[in-house]
């Protein structure tokens, strides 16, 4: 009997312990799966310190971060709230500096370093990733010679010395700010390839294109794939130029070269040409190569189909109601809106026609004056004139000098 009593007590004790253990398990807080995973992946943690990575005696990177840890497999280290960072290429030269980011990941084995513009799980918020990047002028102490990068993500590959920058990327140089979806930088060539919704903001206007190449040593930017340049600056006439290709520089006082199906519009004037040069310093736009210019009356507006008709050489409808000027070249002032055409100048308007060496257009008076070997057509004959004045709004041709009498058409 006594043995049975002890057995009952023993079994009851075991049962009680099992129940208590189960209750403790069910009631005790448990770490979420991602925290358990995070704990198991950490080998070493550090807080508020400077950390660096080296390989074969050379420095790869150096960061000041609020905190971070090294993975147990030692393949990568994660850094949180990077206050400043430096990245070096395989030759030991500084490539990226002044880097700040919510977090970064470095992999010593692959020599790949990544920085991110938003904390994990907070995509879509404004990026806090910013850095100065080597694009040819990094040796200068003048910070204006450095290129500033703002983006959602930067990946730098030290072995191949290139960077991939993506997500609402910005490349800032002096007074210019270039926006793109993606920027690929070859640090060996000091060259950046840009793609996706390119927009360049400068003090003198706005430029858009599909693709572009930036050459850091010469600070030259080549844009292609539907280039549109809107020249807008205080004290100038709004001028829009479209072309297939454009070449420009970080120094906005240097000229912008445009080529391939150039189309320029300024107020009542629309021109098509093979090539163009825009000069901010000279306050002018120069077009050359088979230029065709339509000049409307003050109350009229340039319609989109007008450019298409000029491009297709379908000028019959234009000749009925507009003033058409063809020449070897034409130059527009971006301040007054006046224009000067030169070389094989021909002006037609409602059946009237005149030709000369040069023509000057006064935008305010809507007056076109032709000079130099001037000829005006009267019937089937061409009459030599000293000058022909064309009143665009009144649709009148007036010839004078070296003719039998002054006359109007």
Locations of regions flagged by a protein language model:
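Mature-chain termini and adjacent capping regions
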Residues: 1-409
């Amino acid at each position: 009997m006594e043995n049975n009593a002890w057995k009952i007590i023993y079994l009851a004790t075991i049962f009680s312990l099992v129940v208590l253990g189960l209750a403790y398990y069910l009631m005790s807080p448990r770490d979420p799966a991602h925290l358990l995973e995070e704990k198991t992946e950490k080998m070493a943690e550090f807080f508020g310190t400077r950390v660096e990575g080296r390989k074969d005696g050379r420095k790869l990177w150096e960061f000041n971060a609020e905190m971070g840890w090294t993975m147990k497999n030692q393949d990568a280290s994660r850094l949180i709230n990077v206050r400043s960072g430096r990245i070096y290429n395989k030759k030991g030269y500084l490539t990226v500096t002044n880097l700040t980011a919510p977090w970064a990941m470095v992999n010593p084995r692959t020599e790949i370093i990544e920085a991110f513009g938003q904390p994990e799980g907070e995509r879509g918020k404004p990026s806090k990733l910013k850095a100065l990047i080597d694009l040819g002028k990094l040796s200068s102490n003048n910070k204006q010679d450095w290129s500033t990068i703002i983006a959602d993500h930067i990946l730098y590959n030290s072995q191949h010395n290139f960077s991939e920058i993506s997500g609402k990327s910005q490349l800032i140089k002096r007074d210019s700010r270039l926006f793109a979806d993606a920027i690929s930088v070859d640090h060996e060539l000091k060259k950046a390839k840009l793609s996706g919704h390119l927009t360049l903001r400068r003090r003198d206007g706005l430029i858009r294109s599909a693709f572009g190449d930036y050459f850091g040593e010469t600070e030259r930017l080549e844009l292609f794939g539907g280039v549109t340049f809107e020249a807008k600056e205080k004290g100038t006439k709004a001028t829009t130029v479209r072309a297939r290709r454009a070449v420009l520089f970080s120094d906005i006082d240097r000229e912008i070269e445009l080529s391939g199906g150039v189309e320029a519009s300024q107020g009542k004037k629309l021109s098509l040409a093979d090539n163009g040069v825009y000069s901010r310093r000279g306050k002018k736009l120069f077009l050359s190569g088979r230029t065709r210019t339509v000049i409307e009356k003050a109350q009229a507006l340039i319609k989109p189909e007008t450019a298409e008709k000029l491009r297709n050489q379908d000028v019959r409808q234009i000749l009925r109601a507009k003033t058409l000027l063809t020449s070897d070249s034409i130059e527009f002032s971006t301040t007054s809106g006046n224009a000067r055409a030169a070389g094989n100048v021909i002006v037609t308007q409602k059946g009237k026609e005149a030709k000369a060496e040069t023509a000057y257009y006064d935008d305010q008076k809507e007056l076109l004056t032709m000079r130099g070997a001037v000829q005006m057509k009267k019937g089937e004959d061409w009459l030599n004139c000293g000058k022909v004045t064309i009143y665009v709004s009144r649709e009148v041709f007036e010839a004078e000098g070296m003719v039998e009498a002054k006359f109007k058409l």
